[in-house]
From Swiss-Prot:
Source organism (scientific name): Haemophilus ducreyi (strain 35000HP / ATCC 700724)
Location(s) in or outside the cell: Cytoplasm
Lineage: Bacteria, Pseudomonadati, Pseudomonadota, Gammaproteobacteria, Pasteurellales
Name of the featured protein: Protein RecA
Residues annotated as transmembrane: none
Function (record text): Can catalyze the hydrolysis of ATP in the presence of single-stranded DNA, the ATP-dependent uptake of single-stranded DNA by duplex DNA, and the ATP-dependent hybridization of homologous single-stranded DNAs. It interacts with LexA causing its activation and leading to its autocatalytic cleavage.
InterPro entries: AAA+_ATPase (IPR003593), DNA_recomb/repair_RecA (IPR013765), DNA_recomb/repair_RecA_CS (IPR020584), P-loop_NTPase (IPR027417), RecA-like_C (IPR049261), RecA-like_N (IPR049428), RecA_ATP-bd (IPR020588), RecA_C_sf (IPR023400)
PANTHER family hit by this protein: MITOCHONDRIAL DNA REPAIR PROTEIN RECA HOMOLOG-RELATED, RECA
An MF annotation (GO) of this entry: ATP hydrolysis activity
Entry's Gene Ontology BP terms: DNA recombination; DNA repair; SOS response
Gene name as annotated: recA
């Protein structure tokens, strides 16, 4: 017994030669790569993993708040909120921006409610958009998995998680209980999807609805449908709400929309952004561009006049926006300068940014107060 204790003590105190340790590690890495393929394990610093490709949301402020210039490719994103808050509008805007840079997009319409006329108005090329209207949740997720594994589709929208009804529930009778069936379906599907999404660099966006938890006395009673799996697998979660209305005289022409980044694995989370969604037009890009350009000094305002590079471009907000629409080259140049200022690069710490902090709502609130 004493000899065994002495042997254990000698083993514990024995120092491992660093050179031998490095050789052992190299051998283990080589064995893993041989068994599972090249790239199955690597040092984080040896890759460009942090330089994540992004697709613009169509909102400059939201792109800046997301930290990388939009929604990350090769990841799962969840967008949720109350009814008529702008969830589908935001995802159609993402599709329009993705198509503009040559990406192939698909829309899995589980709600059977996509309006092609509205999608076209938002800039979506509906002739190039792939659309599926599945009969049940299993079919929708199988189609999604097949599109991801093909490697030929870059952006997939699933609208919505709440409409992914399990086949057993559809074939059953009204009033039958199917406790946890949809949650199990989502959990199984996401386990299958995650690795393929990363391998094919495909962006999959799930739209989700809000439900109320019964009997919650303290804290937020709201929850999303489909169980907890999506919360864990999503790299980005956006909470979108309608915060007010946009009026032209007495007529309501749009809605003020607030988006909170509830979760973000690719940049700092918990930022909030506000922008307008105009009915029949989508996100009011030029309105947002003018606000951000003024806040960051690219456009100056003196009294009611706006000026750019010393040249007056319009008296009042509406005239300045009209000038930006009539001069798309200048608007694009200003937008690129704003993006360069506000959006983090992979090697740049967040502390080095920025004159306008998108997490600080005061700049946005002041700007929108001026509009009113």
């Amino acid at each position: 017994m004493a000899a065994d204790k002495k042997a254990q003590k000698n083993t514990a105190t024995k120092q491992i030669d660093p050179e031998q340790k490095e050789k052992a590690l190299a051998a283990a890495l080589a064995q893993i790569e041989k068994q599972f393929g090249k790239g199955s394990i690597m040092r984080l610093g040896d890759t460009q993993a942090l330089d994540i490709e992004a697709v613009s949301t169509g909102s400059i402020g939201l792109d800046a708040a997301l930290g990388i210039g939009g929604l990350p490719m090769g990841r799962i994103v969840e967008i949720y909120g109350p009814e008529s808050s702008g969830k589908t509008t935001l995802t159609l805007s993402v599709i329009a921006q993705a198509q503009r840079i040559g990406k192939t997009c698909a829309f899995i319409d589980a709600e059977h409610a996509l309006d092609p006329v509205y999608a076209r108005k938002l800039g979506v090329d509906i002739d190039a958009l792939l659309i599926s209207q599945p009969d049940n949740g299993e079919q929708a997720l199988e189609i999604c998995d097949a599109l991801v594994r093909s490697g030929a589709v870059d952006v997939i929208i699933v609208d919505s998680v709440a409409a992914l009804t399990p086949k057993a529930e559809i074939e059953g009778d009204m009033g039958d209980s199917y406790m946890g069936l949809q949650a199990r379906l989502m959990s199984q599907a996401l386990r299958k999807l995650t690795a393929n999404i990363k391998a094919t660099n495909c962006l999959v966006v799930f739209i989700n609805q809000i439900r109320m938890k019964i009997g919650v006395m303290f804290g937020n009673p709201e929850t999303t449908t489909g169980g907890n799996a999506l919360k864990f697998y999503a790299s980005v979660r956006l909470d979108i709400r309608r915060s007010g209305v946009v009026k032209d005289g007495d007529e309501v022409v749009g809605s003020e929309t607030k988006v909170k980044i509830v979760k973000n694995k690719v940049a700092p989370p918990f930022r909030e952004v506000q922008f307008d969604i105009m009915y029949g037009e989508g996100i009011a890009r030029m309105n947002e561009l003018l606000i951000l350009a003024e806040a960051n000094g690219f456009i100056q305002k003196a009294g009611a006049w706006f000026s750019y590079n010393g040249t007056k471009i319009g008296q009042g907000k509406n005239n300045a926006i009209k000038w930006l629409k009539e001069n798309p080259e200048v608007a694009e140049k200003i937008e690129q300068e704003i993006r360069n200022l506000l959006i983090l690069t992979p090697d740049q710490p967040a502390s080095e940014k920025l004159e306008l902090d998108v997490n600080d709502e005061s700049d946005f609130d002041e700007a929108f107060e001026e509009q009113e």
